[in-house]
Amino acid sequence: GSQLAGEIGAISAEHLIVCPPEGIASMAKGGVIACLLPATSFNLGAVFAPARDMVNAGVPVAMATDFNPGSCPCLNMQFVINLGCLKYKLTPEEVLTAVTLNGAAAIDLADKVGSVEEGKLGDLVIWDAPDLDYICYRVGSNLAKTVIKRGEIV
């Protein structure tokens, strides 16, 4: 799927767990966002996508939970963030981009959400953490202090 996504210039390639080097090269050439589901790999005991290789090749990476009762009963985005650093070997900054702006871009909504900018909907999480590294490597703790959706605290 990754190679075809690059060949046809898809916005994104979804559910990537296994992705050969040819697929990575094709996505890089086609400007395709690779959508990765680390909690699915974790739950299934499957391999983890070669995210570091993708980023090194210039492929934008997005990450999500893929919550479903069969292959991924995980709703926890902080766990996805943890896995992004620990299993994908991405930096905290790369992971933050993957779960925000690149995720929005993968569903063609980067003009509305994914970053804090004037004119966007105002979705934001305030973390109880001294820095971004703490969020990425503190596994098993809910560090979300405040969640703001469309400018309103929820």
Language-model segments: residues:
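Short, glycine-/Ser/Thr-/acidic-enriched flexible segments
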Residues: A39-F42, N68-P69, D131-L132, E152-V154
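Conserved beta-strand positions that form and line the central face of beta-propeller blades
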Residues: S12, S115, T146
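Active-site core of metal-dependent hydrolases
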Residues: G1-A49
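Residues in and immediately flanking transmembrane alpha helices
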Residues: M27-A28, F79, C136
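Thr-Gly-centered strand-to-loop micro-motif
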Residues: A13-L16, L36-A39, M63-T65, S71, ...
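His/Asp/Glu-enriched, well-ordered alpha-helical/loop segment
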Residues: E7-I8, V47-A129
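Structural beta-strand/beta-sheet cores of well-ordered domains, especially the beta-sheet scaffolds
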Residues: G30-V32, A57, G122, K145
